[in-house]
């Protein structure tokens, strides 16, 4: 019996079953959830081929992350996949399935309604849903030729959508022209021309929510989605985190409407949700899109830590935000000449990313490290990635960082989820993340595919409540805890280099303060202390202890909720501050209190419930009664600040950092400034996928607004 049990755990299992299939000509059904084979009772078993199913099941339940090796060719026994799929896998040198693929592929094929799959990033989940989608396209070429899409994949960002497309291409490359014709794939994202039209004969569509919603609102395009076989939501938790719930609700309604045009009215598509976390919001979303009868597939060990066990996490404690930036800069300069140093540096805003990138570039030009050796010997690169960049520029950056084995990528949260880079040795975070889940996914950019990596967060004393939240809510264990002590004899390179970028520094401070207003409410930071620390950094770099920042009055009162008497120390506003307003003790409390009430959250991500996201079907859904951050239309009936709506006025598209805070309009006068290229992500939207550099005047005063939230469907 021990011999039989060992056979069940070895790779010979699949070959034996295939041999039995050839010998008896019987149908074998592969159960991915158990990784076992169901034998028809009419088949006589032989000792050689006998498999201890209980041993296999017990092995999986005891250690689901340590799977036995199962080759993709084992799926042939199910007779549910076209041979061209296995040819594509073979040509791409993909031999064995990961745990996610073993557990999810066949349930996706067999389900009548849908599946919810919990899997960490970097575990091969894209291929797990790619194979069923490709098979559906191969089985229904007649419908595709009649303009009917067979599979739809929805991703939260355009970078992730492009990465998903690349995974599909791995299977579809080196195929015959006939296979290519049956599996024609389209990507619908912002910043790229939409080539999808009713006569396009698309088989598979990969889209971001905003662009997909715009397509579905076009009556000419709606029939194309009438005969879907699969609908996949990748990174479902992030879709909800970023406030896409209303957009997903519209997508759901429009897909139901499309059924009226179905070639096969009785056909019902299957839905698959892939998510790194499955909380109440994801569960409610699954109930609304699939129903309560779905299969839940957990590919995460119940005893595993929330973050990857191969990541060496460490804290670098500093006394101030100024020290955090100096310490991180010194850390990079001290390690950038290491042979295998390949780091991702996360900052919370676009302008912060741009500023830090410029300072690193100056350090390279001034040879503050051995840049010649790093470049010539290791091929080192210093790159940036954020949402203000054009799509072509972002694509080039992603390709370059994937190719290089050495260097630094400075980026916003746009790269925190989905994007897969090989051999990242370090993840460096400069500030608290907007949510605990964001922190988890950022550090997940290192230690991919069984490798090891380091994650360092530079955190100031006023921000320590974020670390406490990580430890309390997710049980994060930091294996290294270091206190930064500045060497007073060493030159302050960050201050000197940063002073050359004064304009970029001012833009950075404005957006950073908007971000601080958001997270202060989430983690109950002392906002007064955060503002003081931010200006200490600003004044230190400028070497001006009394430097002030010019902002609009509403930025102080609405974004920071700061009394005029306190704000006068830091800000210049047109016409000055009305000091009498500082006697309003209530307003003073909301700013100076240690975190404040829920109503004083600033602009947190908590739009849809206590967890920061939810999906509630019963909530009224009216285009004129909602405000959106990125990739959604902006309300004309409400005053909108990024992801929250307040009152009855509209302040449209004014944005600070990576979150939108409104564009103010008063009659025929407008007030604001935005950066980048503007590309409307839907026909009815006033401002998503913004950019454009334009400066408008309000009366005699000129004021600034900044790009929208970066980690969106751009």
From Swiss-Prot:
InterPro entries: DEAD/DEAH_box_helicase_dom, Helicase_ATP-bd, Helicase_C-like, P-loop_NTPase. ATP binds at residues 119-126. GO terms for molecular function: ATP binding; ATP hydrolysis activity; RNA binding; RNA helicase activity. It is found in: Mitochondrion matrix. One of its GO terms (biological process) is regulation of translation. A motif (DEAD box) lies at residues 234-237. Residues 581-714 are annotated as: Disordered. It catalyses: ATP + H2O = ADP + phosphate + H(+). One of its GO terms (cellular component) is mitochondrial matrix. Pfam families: DEAD, Helicase_C. A motif (Q motif) lies at residues 74-102. Disulfide bonds: none annotated. Residues 335-498 form the Helicase C-terminal domain. ATP-dependent RNA helicase required for mitochondrial splicing of group I and II introns. Also required for efficient mitochondrial translation. Belongs to the DEAD box helicase family. DDX18/HAS1 subfamily. The Q motif is unique to and characteristic of the DEAD box family of RNA helicases and controls ATP binding and hydrolysis. This is ATP-dependent RNA helicase MSS116, mitochondrial. It comes from Meyerozyma guilliermondii (strain ATCC 6260 / CBS 566 / DSM 6381 / JCM 1539 / NBRC 10279 / NRRL Y-324).
